[in-house]
Amino acid sequence: MAADKSASIPEVVTEAIVVIDIVESTTTSNLFGWYAVGRNIHRDLRSFVTDIGMGRGLRCVRSTGDGYLLTFFNPQSAETAAISATEAVFELLRRTEIRNREVADERSLNLRCAIHLGEVDVVLNDREGPHVSFAFRLESISRGSLPAALNPIAPEQLPLKNYVLCSEEVAGILERRSTLWSTRSIGLFRLKGFPGFREVFRVLSRQDPE
């Protein structure tokens, strides 16, 4: 009994957690059809996710219906995992931009992305724990969230699509360890299930800051 109980305890690791959401996925599928448009959008995203994860420590890929939960791991450094995750997300946005130039507007793939870092329980093809929930709360932040925030940016400064948000933990890592990206506070938010206000940042490429 003791051995069985021990075997059921999940491994705990520190990983970079990425949540990717397809903007207006359900609306697009309902309007233009899942088989005509929606399925191809999801297939393209899945292909991109597989490619960007190669060589960057991608360990978990789970569909959320309208996007993906991804985690990245580096055995030497959790901070390196956060940098790899950021690199992967911006490569994903780059490929998405190229793709969108070649398809009709209704087939465009537009994303919202969020990056966090923290301890997670490793379960088969999934991750569990409060840090996973936190990453989903980050991704859910939109222009509509700004009026309730402290010291928010102007709504027009937050794009409607194809942007990256991150937690304070990830912002600190990027500012210390990378010259490729900068971070900009968008305000302090109350995130459902988490106490107090949490500062949230937008991640920007230094090569293309806007």
Which positions does each model-derived feature cover?
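A generic fold-level signal
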Residues: P10-V12, S63, S108-N110, R127-G129, ...
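Intrinsically disordered, glycine/charged-rich C-terminal tails and inter-domain linkers
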Residues: M1-I9, T14, N151-E210
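Short, solvent-exposed loop/turn segments at secondary-structure junctions
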Residues: T71, E119-L124, P147, I173
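Catalytic NTP-binding/metal-coordinating core of nucleotidyl cyclase/transferase enzymes
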Residues: A2-E87
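Short, glycine/charged-enriched secondary-structure capping and boundary segments
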Residues: F32-Y35, R127-H131, T179-W181
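A generic structural signal for short hydrophobic patches within well-formed alpha-helices
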Residues: S25-T28, V120, V170-A171
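Short loop/turn motifs enriched for small/polar and acidic residues
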Residues: D66, A114-V120, S167-E169
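Alpha-helical scaffold within the catalytic cores of cyclic-nucleotide enzymes
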Residues: R39-L58, N74-C113, L117-E119, P130-L146
